[in-house]
Amino acid sequence: TPALRSILSQTFLRCKTAQIAFNIDIQYADFNFIAFPDIYSIFENPLDNAVTACSDIHSTELNKEINLKIVRKNNIIGIDIRNTRENSILIKNGCIQSTKTDPNGHGMGIKNMKRAIQQYDGFITINYDENIFHVSMTIPISKI
């Protein structure tokens, strides 16, 4: 879809400027059944956060890397985004909080992602460890 192409192009340019490896494996890309604003919630927010997290890596021992994989298995679309990180994860009331210095316009991204995915009867899981942040989303195609 044009919206996804635009998001990926912008992310690629930001990664190139910040010397971040951006690895893309797209095996399925028909998102025409998803509304334009929801495409941005589903893709732009986690990729923007990934670029920010990688840009904040100062360790020479950790590669700055973002991996995006989109697959279809039977009637399920799987979206997997992983990035390296060394920034802190701020949790408040069981929710991940924005750590961006300007709080205006920030802090709604993960909520909007969850809302968009759930609107299409999908699921989202977020996991992280010391050096990896991982967002996994599934959307059933039967919702079309």
Language model feature labels by segment:
Residues 36-61, 115, 119:
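Conserved ATP-binding N-box helix of the HATPase_c
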Residues 108, 112-116:
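A short alpha-helix in the C-terminal ATP-binding CA
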Residues 60-75:
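Short beta-strand/loop element within the Bergerat-fold HATPase_c
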Residues 75-107:
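Glycine-rich/acidic phosphate-handling loop/turn and adjacent ATP-lid/helix
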Residues 22-43:
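Conserved short strand/loop->alpha-helix "switch" segment adjacent to the catalytic nucleotide/phosphoryl-transfer site
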Residues 87, 129-136:
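Glycine-rich nucleotide-binding loop
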Residues 1-18:
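Short beta-to-alpha transition helix within the HATPase_c
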Residues 118-129:
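Glycine-rich ATP-binding loops of the HATPase_c
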